[in-house]
Amino acid sequence: MKPRFIAGPPGTGKTHDFILGLYKKLLKEDYAPEKIVILSHTNVAANQIKEAVLKLPEMQGRGFTLKSMKKTISTIHSYCKGRLLPKEKFDLDDHKNLIIQEKYFKLDPQTDIERKHKFYRYISDARGHGKTLEEYWKICNKDSYKPYTVELIKNLYQIYTDYKKHKDNNKCDYADMVEDFLHPDVKDPDIDALVIDECQDSNVPQTLAIEKMSKNVKEGHYYLVGDADQTLFEYSGSDADKYHKLAANPYDELKEGKRCSEAINKHCRKAIEPIWDHYGSHRVWTPAKYSERHNKGSVGEIIKGNGYYLPNLEQSGNLDILLDKIKNTTETFLFTYRGTPSDIRCRNFFIKHG
């Protein structure tokens, strides 16, 4: 099934305007909520969508709850796991068990095994790219996985895999949830509509899983909603090139910005313009306008905002203005810098000023 790509730059209402609007439209066309599947990449986003859907007038009196809606509005991992035989998620206690079995699991002392521990991050990134451990080693930034080598990773991975599969453990990780869903024995879901929120963050196995989910949708109701310019996870397998090409000829484009001032809009457009030129995928993306909720400005007037260059983080007129805004207003701002070690200096600067 060919997807309908919805291009939505920052703050254009991808979630609360397009997705909720589509949900209401499908309900009016007599599509059953049980067969409308909306998936995102984080529990926070999925929960926000669930809560918003349950507040729709069209959903009142139908008996749905946050718990029951989890079957159709959730993360990609959770949806895949829900269609498989029960397994427990591999966690920190399991990691500690592996350390007892093999000390090299503790070569990286990091306890955040889902995001920071070098061994688990490597196998997650390799699988996210659809590569074997050896294939990924040839293309990755090896320094980011030190002190592990590919030979050590392969040895530990065998121990890790055997541990998960042992009948007394029966564990899985996030990648397993998606890969197990892709097994031919798992039937294609019987759903009428599929919406993927922030689709640009999908890695290789997730993309294959999404395609499997879309096999039985009705009347072309297969939507990828996202922003190619916000493809942040290429390091873990997302495909920016694919989404920039989709953005060059989208099914629909969300044009009205509701978050960024004109100053921020221009700053971001200048940064991303060369990419748009390369793909021929320019966005309209207008600056935000004042509305009644702002309690200032004229309703419908473009929010101008301001842009300030800071020569340093010690003393300048613009720095005084910035600090005043941070401490004495509720205004939001975009603060940009260039790489390391600027990130450390900026973080310490903000900590210093509360």
Regions found by a protein language model. Give the residues of each.
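P-loop NTPase Walker
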Residues: 1-89
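Glycine-rich, phosphate-binding/catalytic loops in enzymes
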Residues: 54-58, 89-90, 211-214, 239-243, ...
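Short active-site loop/helix that positions an aromatic residue
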Residues: 84-86, 345-350
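Residue-level preference for the first positions of well-ordered beta-strands
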Residues: 3-5, 35-37, 192-193, 221, ...
